[in-house]
From Swiss-Prot:
Residues 1-90 form the CARD domain. WD repeats lie at residues 615-654, 657-696, 700-743, 746-785, 798-836, 840-879, 882-921, 964-1003, 1006-1045, 1047-1088, 1091-1130, 1133-1172, 1184-1223. GO terms for cellular component: apoptosome. This is Apoptotic protease-activating factor 1. It comes from Danio rerio (Zebrafish).
Amino acid sequence: MEERARSRLLRSKATLEQDIKASYLMDHMISDGVLTNDEEAKVLSKATRKEQAVALLETLLRKDNRAYISFYNALIRESYGDLASLLHSDLPLLSPEGEKSFADGVSPSVQAILSVGGVPQRPVVFVSRPPLLNLIREMLYQLRDTPGWVTVFGMAGSGKSVMAAEVVRDRSLIKECFPDGVHWLSVGQCERADLLVRMQSLCFRLEQCQSSDTSQRPPSTVEEAKERLRFLMLRRFPRSLLILDDVWDSSSLRSFDIQCRVLLTTRNRALTDSVSGVRYEVPVENGLDEEKALEILALYVNGKMHKLPEQARSIVSECKGSPLVVSLIGALLREFPDRWSYYLRQLQQKQFKRIRKSSSYDYEALDQAMDASLQVLEAEHQELYRDLSVMQKDIKVPAKVLSVLWGLELEEVEDVLQEFVNKSLLFRDCNQRPYRYYLHDLQLDFLAEQNRDQIAELHKKMVRQYQRFYSKRPPDSADKDSLYWYQFIPYHMAKAGLSKELYSLMFSLDWVKEKARIMGSAHLINDYVEYGEILDKENSEVRVQFQEFLSLNGHHLEQRPFPDVVQLALSQPDRSEVYRQALMQAQKRASRGQIYLNWVNKNIEEGLSRLVMHPHQGAVYYACFSKDGSKIASCGASKALRVFKSTSGEKLLELQAHEEDVLCCAFSPDDRHIATCASDRKVKLWNVERGVLIREFEVEHEEQINHCQFTNTGRRVLLATCSNDKFTNTRLWNPNKKTSQNTMFGHMEPVNHCCFSPNDLYLATSSSDGSLKLFEVSSANEWKSIDVDSFFPESDEEIKAMVKCSTWSADGSQIICAARNTVFVFDVETSDLLLKLKTSRLSTIQFCHACPNSSLLAVALSHYTVELWNFESSKKKAECSGHLSWVHCVQFSPDGSLLLSSSDDQTIRLWETDRVHTSSAVALKRDTDVLSSHSDATIIAPDSSNRLQVLSGSTGAVVLESEELSSRIRCSCISRNAAFVALGSEDGTVQVIEVPSSKASVKLSGHTKTVHHCQFTDDCEILITSSEDSTIRVWKWRTGECMVLQGHMEPVRKFHLLSSSSSPHLFSWSFDGTVKVWDLTRGQMLQDLVCHEGAVLSCDVSSDGRLFATTSANRTAKVWSSASWKMLFLLEGHKDCVRSCRFSWDNKRLATGDDNGEIRLWSMLDGALLKICPRDTKDSMNSYHAGWVTDLHFSPDNRVLVSTAGYIKWWSVESGEALQTFYTMGGNLKKIHVSPDFSTFITVDSIGILYILKRLEGEGT
């Protein structure tokens, strides 16, 4: 019976006893089914009318709401209207609608049942957890027709008891499954005597609910109490639910194995293994989500969630949403609302004793609650559990690691861990095989605090056990269970204070190689940053050397197949410890026949980027720093958003953000959110910490969205976007609303970029209509407009000079924008042009950004470089080379110390602003020639200043440098006696220069277009040149006499000179698809062969002169007979243009290379395909060789093949496997010069760096 009705009966009891005649009323109540004949007989057995009335009312008080209503109706029918009126105001509601109408969702009838059963009321502050409640209810419905057990288990303070009480506040559940009531018993940790008292109390409560007047004595033993309960449940309460709260051990639980329906809460999920009957389990998650936890704190302090201080989120994060901790701190804050920072500090400092009881929880302080779980373990297991103090937060550990730590068999360890899991002392991730184990943050903090004085020793134990177990060989990198050691053994060494062991490990190239193979470079770099202070005490220079090696080669270490780390390390400066270790290892391996190359002329410049990252598969369109500079976000053609540490490149977040290319991303002023915009016309807002979508704004732009940016300060946060729309192309958004707040009108063409002024008062927009506009943010009105196109007088009226981007000076007084190859600096107030900076005429500016605390301006260019300018002095301060394709974006860090650049080459480079400078070394062009001798080589190459340089082949030192030429040098060659150098120019002229005087000997005119190739004959008397004008010229260069070989219809890019006993012949090939053979003495065409339908891209002649091969843009290669001039083999299979070919020295094989980076080896016996190099492994650029295969050379013994494309590779001719790879700084190698003994390799890359590579010989060779 509900409380109000029972109270009314008790208050009216005296009046009713005086007036009613029980015998008249009982007939009606028996008819209604609320009174039995036995109960009527007991009442009538009383001697007097009043005694009968007293007995009837006593019986009625033990009944439910239906009995109250039946009694009320009987009073009406027997004309006791005045008495009925006493009861009328508290009549219970029995209709379903009435049951649901109460504010807290719990009807009085349900509340009455729960009160009788001793179920605790809701806590003062309560937040529902519907998914968990539904799961428990679902399990309880399984007990509707049969007895059984439902176990709700979880760690201390996870909210088990609150959920168990809440789940039965459900009328439907009680009516359908437990109509005979719900009974609650708190068990806890108790001895047998205490357990008997609790069971006696339950027996008494159940007996009170019966109508029997006989009072039984309490049971005197646990066994008797168990039998009494069994009888009561089976006979009197067959469909009731017994809730056992906080059960600790199986012996206590067995005392309630009485074939009834039981819901129990416990920290030990395995308890029900000791009882009979069906069993169901419901795990309770360790923590609430952030929103629920904040809701609890808000309720405690009577505030709104969005008005809670920032410390509230930190408290929730620190305790991982533990319901117990949140409630304890919330209750304390109710008394002391200004102590947010204090309680956060106590949590961070693990001062659990100060977070003391202020709720109905059983323990005085948080540490007591956690210690209680630990005390039930055996002493031996307590020691093992203590060792877990060395675990890191959020790190899941395999059992094999703990097997090493404890020195136990794996099966024994798994048994111990199972016990810890069962007691909610440890958690198991079953989604991984083998299982991974982890501690809740609070448990770990508690352990760390409890064992504070022994932490170093515990870490030392971890290290010593690791060293003992892996003394003979390191952990197997292929074994997933061993990955823990690679990730965390430096951490344990540092925490143990084992500095020497840490130096030895981290200053080892073997360790670097193995860890990089498994985890990539970012983890390693992070280790050098994390433990830098310890390592620097040993040798700060060596620490920097290892860190720089990883930073500059990190993108290579992401490649699969994994590169040879020893070869990468050989490119480090000779003074570097990394180089010293690599050289020792390389010499040992070279003794066994392996190929290693030493870069003898390396000069690692200070201006190189300090960190190279490869975050995306595809172009990186945009990257930006967080406001605190600790993180970098990037996006691009991969459609993904990625966030990583700016110190190491370690990935923090990666998610698929859009369905099309993501063009821009931006951090919010507080760094908690990131906005993204894309080609799919969508703008999205993401939570950085959790990686979840917060909001997808309405699609209001009609075309792709090019850029997005938040305001710089958090006073009034707005997001600006701009797009390719014709009119409504710039919008302002409130991050809390799905629709835009304002639209800025003015541009009639796409807007490429937008940015807020430093004080957020203005928004600058850069448009394809040739203008730069400034809008007032508050009104969205146009404030100023600058016609940038008007500063290009040569501009076509119909094609405007597109303004690509803009940026504000640090003080906001100047606005800087870029169009074509020019940077303009304007005064904001007057719109006057203050300065104009012109970059290379051959490039266009893709992006620019002004340093936030200086007058430096970074400019991203289409010709793969980044330039730094001082926009006050108009001077170029530095040029940053290294990217292999267009640079899309540049941005300074908030403090101006770093500069990032993102590129089409899929990388992001990080530069130190004060270390980059304009290189003193002149960049060479790739149009080189090399003359090899037994002891040395001579290299000639034009440079970026259009001078010819002659360099030493052993050191790369400049021997000679010509005057600057007026027309761009496009080819060069050196005579066999090294006395003369020839140059072919873009204007068609040819010059011969004497060496070493650099005196211009002769200038030859005749070609009308670019000269592509030149070569001296062996006697140095004849110079042959080929040109874009389709002709070949044979010069007696000393006299200027010339013979013209005409016949080709398209440019002649190259030719091949053949010497024979009779007369010299010349092979030439052209884009017209033909190969022609010429007699050089008479200038006569001997053969004119139509070889391919497409352009002929390369040709080679076998060493015996019997065969020649041609390759074409039509994806085929052909082999021809020099005797019959007929085709012998058609070689098909390449999937792209076949750009290079080379016969082996024994003429048994032909190698061909294509624009997809693939190399094929063919038999010259029958034209059969022998090998494909590589077979199926593409690199990070989705190519087999990072670009076109431009050159091929066989070793003299025909066992090795070297190739050039994006880098240099050496291949086994027999197996087709790669033997070695040398990664150049730049890419797009044009050719490689190989010494006759195959020991020296010389090339120049796309950024003008010369490589003289000498093959290392083995030790003692």
